[in-house]
Design a protein with these regions (language model features):
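Short glycine/acidic-enriched loop and turn motifs that connect beta-strands
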Residues: 3-4, 95-96, 144-148
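Extracytoplasmic beta-rich repeat domains
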Residues: 13-31, 36-43, 61-82, 113-124
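Surface-exposed loop/turn positions within WD40 beta-propeller blades
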Residues: 43, 85, 94-95, 154
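Short loop/turn segments that connect beta-strands within beta-propeller blades
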Residues: 51-53, 102-105, 163
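Conserved beta-propeller blade signature
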Residues: 57, 87-90, 137-139
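A structural motif specific to WD40 beta-propellers
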Residues: 57-58, 107-110
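Blade-level signature of beta-propeller repeat domains, shared across WD40, Kelch, NHL, RCC1
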Residues: 122-163
Length: 163
């Protein structure tokens, strides 16, 4: 038994090797502008929850529409990285940026441009110099999906030193 149906040009198809299944992946953008997901605002948020007290500590929209025309919060794929010093790092699906928030207050501490969208979960590592002093780094894979109206197809690994 096989089912056939029409799909749009923006759909990526992939055979599931060794099975009788296939994958169809597409972006879910509005049919009018073609750039906004079909959902209400904010489209993406970050929040911190105190699990012990079972309460939300803070919540805020994450990411801006290009050229800061709208501060709507944008969806993101990657997860956060939380350092032992209370810095919360996270990338953005549509923006080519890495963000750092204060985990206690939600204050945006830092943001930096990336060569492509920060779709991945950041990670951290430390390197010791010849004198035994450790320096901590945050690294993120920056890449995109060429089908995304705000993204680009690219492959980068970008590292930042934490001072």
């Amino acid at each position: 038994y096989r089912a056939f149906f029409n799909i749009g040009d923006d759909v990526e198809l992939g055979v599931q090797a060794g099975t009788s299944y296939a994958m169809a992946r597409h972006t879910m953008f509005d049919p009018y502008l073609g750039v906004l997901p079909c959902a209400g605002f904010p489209l993406g948020e970050v929040m911190v929850i105190d699990i012990n007290e079972q309460r939300q500590l803070w919540r805020r929209p994450h990411g801006d529409f290009p050229a800061k025309v709208l501060s709507i919060g944008l969806p993101h794929n990657g997860g956060p990285l939380l350092t032992s010093t209370g810095i919360f790092f996270i990338g953005s699906l549509f923006e080519s940026k890495l963000y750092a928030y204060d985990v206690d207050s939600g204050e945006l501490l830092w943001q930096h441009a990336l060569p492509a969208p920060g779709n991945a979960t950041p990670m951290s590592y430390a390197v010791k110099d010849s004198e035994g002093n450790a320096k901590q780094f945050v690294v993120i894979a920056a890449g995109g999906d060429a089908r995304s109206p705000l993204g680009s197809s690219a492959d980068y690994i970008v590292a930042f030193a934490i001072e």
